[in-house]
């Protein structure tokens, strides 16, 4: 995290008096609150396919977004340069939202807290493309060496660094430098006339030091894990049954099926199934659900959100009780509470809205093997792909790529290509056991609620007593 204010002022070619002029202009028609979001981002990627390496590209993005809030209305405009004349035009455009609007909301300063969740990540820009070639070629070689059935390997390495500066009408001035490194490897396996593929990704808010032998060995080993089961797997008969969710990537179901319903914009508008449940028990006592912006080097973490609010660890559910929604400044002002650091945006062209960061369920006390042993008939699932969720009703459907049948307390036949169908509140209420093996999945998770932002997820092993499994 860079703390040298002059670096940011020089990067965006502005002065503090100019920032004050812009916010004054933005409030010239009587808005309640105004803020400026400056951003300079560099992106780089390399792709290895069929043994050939190509530069996926290097590009930059630069600009400022200006927001005005009046009551529950938002005015937003942006400029792709920081010439004062163009920024003043954007501020004037955003200020028009206040015309003819009498309603007001009160915004207060947030705690002046200095976070540092990615302390050594700013060195991507100093590296030449050639510095990464040994890593991706050695990773390709190691993956091929793991299994003779591999016929193709594709590897993508990418990095970005975003320098942001935020200023608002409360006088808060915040800066942050946000690194992101990602590696994705895909292997295609051929066995007779059958083909399977497996992709593994890792992503962190780290600098180039993340590209090391340990990461290479981890990815290569994970790509070939359980591939025999993939070739043997079949679709089971569907129906109502117990489902054991494996630790780690199963957290995506928590994110999609339940996490979005905890975002405050849906709740203040009465659109979430949890809108009237604050302070009530919504699941068993052993369940606590967290959205965390403070995990060191995590893809979803942030020293500050995109409104300049310090990152924090927010308990949405504690001991089975709904205790908090996920707030940006607007929803926090509406509820009369402090924001939780969840105001996020894709880039300066977008208005911030409540978004998750790293969402996970905390550890319980149950033994994962004991959970499986307790199930007479059900499925164990550990790898998901896409899903659909209805925020208002809480209904969800998820596609499961791999897992196992559970028969008489034992994992038996491998399964694939099934759907898990349920309802978020009902699934929470039907949690029968929470394991003691919490795992955060460090894949390249990206949430697409109106905009794309990096997130993370995780879970311990969890037993849900009753879900619909869509199979044969």
Language model region names:
Residues 1-472:
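N-terminal small-residue-enriched
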């Amino acid at each position: 995290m860079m703390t040298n204010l002059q670096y940011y002022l020089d990067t965006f070619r502005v002065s503090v008096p100019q920032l004050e002029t812009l916010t004054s202009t933005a409030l010239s028609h009587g808005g309640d609150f105004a803020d400026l979001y400056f951003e300079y981002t560099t992106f780089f990627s390399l792709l290895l396919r069929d043994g050939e390496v190509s530069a996926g590209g290097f590009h930059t993005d630069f600009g400022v977004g200006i927001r005005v809030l009046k009551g529950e209305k938002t005015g937003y405009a942006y400029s792709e340069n920081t010439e004062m004349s163009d920024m003043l035009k954007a501020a004037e455009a955003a200020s028009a939202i206040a015309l003819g609007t009498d309603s007001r909301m009160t915004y207060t300063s947030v705690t002046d807290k200095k976070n540092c969740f990615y302390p050594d990540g700013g060195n991507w820009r100093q590296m030449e493309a050639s510095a990464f070639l040994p890593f991706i070629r050695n990773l390709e070689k190691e993956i091929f060496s793991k299994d003779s059935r591999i016929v193709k390997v594709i590897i993508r390495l990418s990095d970005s660094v975003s320098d942001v500066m935020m200023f608002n009408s409360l006088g808060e001035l915040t800066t942050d430098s946000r690194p992101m490194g990602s590696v994705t490897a895909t292997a295609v396996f051929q066995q007779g006339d059958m083909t399977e593929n497996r992709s593994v990704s890792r992503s962190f808010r780290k600098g180039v030091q993340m590209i090391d032998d340990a990461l290479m060995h981890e990815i290569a080993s994970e790509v070939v894990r359980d591939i025999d089961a993939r070739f043997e797997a079949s679709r089971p008969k569907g129906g109502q049954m117990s489902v054991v969710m494996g630790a780690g990537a199963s957290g995506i179901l928590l994110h999609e099926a339940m996490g979005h319903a905890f975002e405050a914009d849906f709740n203040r508008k009465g659109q979430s199934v949890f809108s009237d449940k604050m302070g009530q028990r919504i699941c068993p006592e052993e369940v606590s659900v967290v959205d965390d912006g403070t995990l060191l080097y995590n893809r979803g973490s942030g020293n500050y959100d995109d409104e300049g609010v310090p990152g924090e660890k927010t308990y949405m559910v504690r001991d089975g009780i709904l205790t908090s929604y996920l707030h940006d400044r607007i929803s926090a002002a509406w509820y009369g509470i402090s924001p939780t650091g969840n105001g996020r945006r894709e880039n300066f062209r977008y208005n911030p809205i409540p978004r998750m960061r790293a969402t996970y369920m905390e550890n319980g006390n149950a033994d994962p093997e004991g959970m499986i042993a307790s199930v007479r008939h059900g499925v164990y699932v550990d790898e998901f792909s896409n899903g659909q969720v209805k925020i208002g009703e809480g209904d969800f459907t998820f596609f499961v790529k791999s897992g196992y049948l559970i028969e008489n307390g034992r994992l038996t036949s491998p399964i694939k290509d099934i759907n898990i169908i349920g309802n978020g509140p009902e699934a929470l209420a039907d949690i029968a056991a929470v394991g003691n093996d919490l795992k955060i999945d460090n894949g390249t998770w990206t949430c697409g609620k109106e905009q794309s932002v990096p997130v993370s997820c995780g879970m311990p092993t969890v037993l849900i007593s009753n879900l619909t499994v869509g199979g044969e």
